[in-house]
Regions:
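Conserved "right-hand" nucleotidyltransferase catalytic core of DNA-directed polymerases
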Residues: 1-92, 181-188, 192-304
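Active-site-proximal helix-loop-helix substrate-binding element of RNase H-like nuclease domains
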Residues: 35, 72-212, 222-226, 230
């Protein structure tokens, strides 16, 4: 049973094996069954943008192959008209050369659901546009619910039991030096569309889960506005005084040296305070402090 095997891989965190299995399942009936449970969206690739392509409420995602969204290359931009059940896909050039698109992106009257609002706001700013009207951030919602699975959409869908139609990026783009957009553009476009459709499907279940956990207000009133502030900090940067930092650095180095000397005096010998193994011997063998936890490699010196 492939579904049971995938769940086993997830539980055991066999991520490499899971991604390999997903790569083999690109065209399987299991994938098709999941897709059948979600609304069917028409996919349209745009060479030009007109007003009818820009809905009042949308789900938007910008694709990059690099993790660093400040310097990465945009390989595609996709958004959904939820009401009309259409996914539009276009290039960076078409989107950011369109005044209509940039005006829509900056409009607070046009709601946008995102995967990562901070990332989208920074990407837009680096291309001379504002990103406003953010109504939902999928990653922030997921992080509040389950911090360990706030990564790819493939992981997020399991939290609220949404049908999974999205493959891991690695299964589509490859990894390392061979990471690239597929030569078959239909595969690439479908991957982007699947991300968008999944984000549409995730919004309400994630909101319901946040409400159950009494974190919806935290999400809406604190976390979402904070993401915008953090994005603006990344965009504008933070002015620092180099001389002041250097003075403080010297003070910190001296303070750390004094603390290390004091530790050695209390221990009665010199040792590497940054070595958990050496620190464990001093604390639990020489000073006879109570042992809270012991691992295969020695005493645990963790805070807990």
């Amino acid at each position: 049973n492939v579904d049971e095997l995938m769940e086993f891989y997830r539980q055991m965190e066999f991520n490499v094996a899971l991604k390999a299995l997903q790569a083999e399942m690109t065209d399987t009936s299991s994938h098709e069954e999941a897709a059948a449970q979600l609304p069917q969206y028409e996919i349209e690739c745009l060479e030009a943008i007109v007003a009818e392509h820009l809905p009042t409420r949308a789900v938007l995602y910008t694709e990059m192959l690099e993790d660093n969204y400040h310097f990465g290359e945009v390989v595609g931009i996709a958004w959904a008209d939820i009401k009309e059940q259409k996914v539009y896909i276009t290039s960076e050039e078409v989107a950011y050369n369109s005044e209509l698109f940039k005006d829509w992106l900056s409009s607070k009257d046009h709601e946008k659901v995102t995967l990562d609002s901070k990332r989208e706001r920074v990407i837009a700013a680096n291309r001379g546009a504002e990103f406003n009207g953010i109504s939902f951030d999928t990653l922030i919602a997921t992080y509040l619910i389950d911090v360990h699975n706030a990564q790819e959409l493939t992981d997020i869908v399991r939290i609220v039991d949404v049908p999974s139609i999205v493959l891991y990026d690695e299964a589509v783009y490859g990894k390392g030096a061979k990471k690239a957009v597929p030569e078959d553009k239909a595969v690439f476009n479908q991957h982007l569309a699947n991300k968008i459709i999944t984000m549409v499907a995730l919004e309400e279940p994630l909101k319901e889960k946040l409400s159950e956990l009494h974190m919806l207000e935290l999400f809406q009133e604190i976390e979402m506005p904070l993401a915008i502030i953090l994005a603006d900090m990344e965009i504008r940067g933070i002015a620092v005084n180099r001389e002041v930092l250097e003075v403080r650095n010297e003070k910190m180095i001296k303070l750390l040296a004094q603390m290390e000397t004091s530790i050695h005096e209390h221990a009665g010998e010199e040792f590497n305070v940054n070595s958990p193994k050496q620190l464990g011997v001093i604390l639990f063998e020489k000073l006879n402090l109570p042992v809270i936890k012991k691992t295969k490699t020695g005493y645990s010196t963790a805070a807990d």
